[in-house]
């Protein structure tokens, strides 16, 4: 088991905090993120990037007078009228022709290059609209989460939707603050990227005690939040998911 210092997480801290430095937002073209959540995520971010058709979603929910900082992708989904309106209001549009990468990966790479230029290694990027539509899109979002975590282990990437949130926990010890006004009761630890040799938890209804997680063996789905602080120690990267009810 890794012995790194404990990493502290608060997936919905942005609901009660103003925009902070190195807090980026990527917007996807998904109905799983409604206007109230998108607006709160937007307000808490110092940089907003729409992934191709995410520009349509942002435009239709928030209007043309609130442009993102950038639109990134192959631009086969973003409407021409949306791009024109955004460019008129100062948004940078970046066409990236790479059929081996999806638009979320392109947007995350764009955010990462911006951090690199500023010497930032521990930023936070939140992805709005990662759930609720096509299952292959959800898996692509999780794949992007794993790739991002492997490339930038000190940074954090959180997937957000109106009904769920998820983030990758790297090998080591973690403490997660539970915001009971919006999170739970259900949660899970999912070994998406491969077997997790050992996981130990505190603060859940059914805690794990050094058990192995793997598809076809044990998956900690439909667990329940028990305490206001959840402690997790994992030997390998594992996906943390939590139910969300924004009211």
Regions found by a protein language model. Give the residues of each.
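N-terminal beta-strand-loop-alpha-helix module at the start
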Residues: 2-85, 89
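Solvent-exposed alpha-helices and their adjacent loops that cap or buttress functional pockets
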Residues: 14-21, 39-43, 63-64, 85-87, ...
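Anionic-ligand-binding alpha/beta catalytic cores of soluble enzymes and soluble regulatory domains
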Residues: 122-178
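Long, charged alpha-helical interface segments
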Residues: 162, 168-247
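Long, charge-dense
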Residues: 74, 80-87, 97, 101, ...
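Short glycine/serine/threonine-rich phosphate/pyrophosphate-binding segments
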Residues: 34-36, 57, 101-107, 134-139
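Short phosphate-binding loop-to-helix
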Residues: 90-119
């Amino acid at each position: 088991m890794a012995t790194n210092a404990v990493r502290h997480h608060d997936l919905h801290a942005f609901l009660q905090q103003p925009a902070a430095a190195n807090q980026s937002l990527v917007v996807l073209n998904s109905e799983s993120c409604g206007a109230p959540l998108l607006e709160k995520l937007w307000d808490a971010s110092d940089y907003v990037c729409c992934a191709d058709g995410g520009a349509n979603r942002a435009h239709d929910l928030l209007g043309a007078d609130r442009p993102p900082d950038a639109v990134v992708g192959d631009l086969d989904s973003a409407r021409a009228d949306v791009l024109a309106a955004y460019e008129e209001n100062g948004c940078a549009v970046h066409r990236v022709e790479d059929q081996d990468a999806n638009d979320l990966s392109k947007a995350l790479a764009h955010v990462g290059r911006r951090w690199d230029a500023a010497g930032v290694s521990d930023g936070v990027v939140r992805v709005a609209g990662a759930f609720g539509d096509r299952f292959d899109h959800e898996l692509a979002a999780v794949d992007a989460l794993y790739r991002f975590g492997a490339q930038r282990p000190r940074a954090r990437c959180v997937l957000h939707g109106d009904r769920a949130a998820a983030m990758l926990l790297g090998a080591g010890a973690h403490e997660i603050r539970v915001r009971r006004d919006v999170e739970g009761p259900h949660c899970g630890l999912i070994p998406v990227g491969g077997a997790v040799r050992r996981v130990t938890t505190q603060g859940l209804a059914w805690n794990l005690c050094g058990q192995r997680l793997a598809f076809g063996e044990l998956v900690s789905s439909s667990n329940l939040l028990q305490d206001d602080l959840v402690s997790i120690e994992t030997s390998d990267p594992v996906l943390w998911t939590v139910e969300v009810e924004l009211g």
